[in-house]
């Protein structure tokens, strides 16, 4: 029932937006903000039915620690053509400091599994300015991301948001 409500709201929003902008096609759709890969592929397919998206880049954000690799092919069948993997760092110590549920090897495995499933458009999210991270360590993370040869790398500075664990207990940078 919740999915049907979302689908109706998403479809109504998308159709209204397209009508206002006089655009016939959407160029990019991004399912992000946490762990949208926990959605079943058929649910994503139903959401995508609501808007014209032929030829669009459709991204699904995936946490390497919770990725269900057996679903990667099903995501493609649902219309997802780009995966964005939240690596954040290739240092297991940094990942632990950040409270991440994955380790470096899981990111490397997720990239390999995505390629095996047929994804040819992969993004890696990594961060710099992490607690105690040196410039050399940040650059090492970037080098490791480049070694995996993704089509895109998003290299973000750590941002401490209000009402998060780090806001109440800021890391020493």
Task: State the predicted function of each range.
Residues 1-11, 24-173:
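Conserved non-cysteine loop/helix-boundary elements of the Radical SAM core domain that shape
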Residues 16-23:
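Ala/Thr-enriched low-complexity intrinsically disordered regions
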């Amino acid at each position: 029932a919740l999915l049907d409500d979302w689908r109706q709201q998403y479809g109504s929003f998308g159709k209204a937006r397209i009508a206002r902008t006089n655009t016939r096609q959407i160029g990019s759709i991004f399912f992000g903000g946490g762990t949208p890969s926990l959605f079943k592929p058929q649910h994503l397919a139903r959401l995508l039915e609501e808007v014209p998206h032929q030829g669009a880049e459709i991204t699904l954000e995936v946490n390497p620690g919770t990725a269900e690799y057996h679903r990667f092919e099903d995501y493609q069948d649902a219309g997802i053509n780009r995966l964005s993997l939240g690596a954040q760092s290739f240092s297991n110590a940094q990942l632990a400091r950040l409270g991440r549920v994955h380790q470096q090897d899981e990111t490397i495995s997720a990239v390999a599994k995505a390629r095996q499933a047929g994804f040819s458009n992969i993004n890696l999210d990594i961060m710099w300015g992490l607690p105690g991270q040196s410039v050399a360590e940040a650059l090492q993370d970037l080098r490791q991301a480049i070694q995996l040869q993704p089509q895109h790398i998003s290299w973000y500075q750590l941002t401490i948001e209000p009402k998060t664990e780090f806001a109440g207990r800021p890391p020493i940078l």
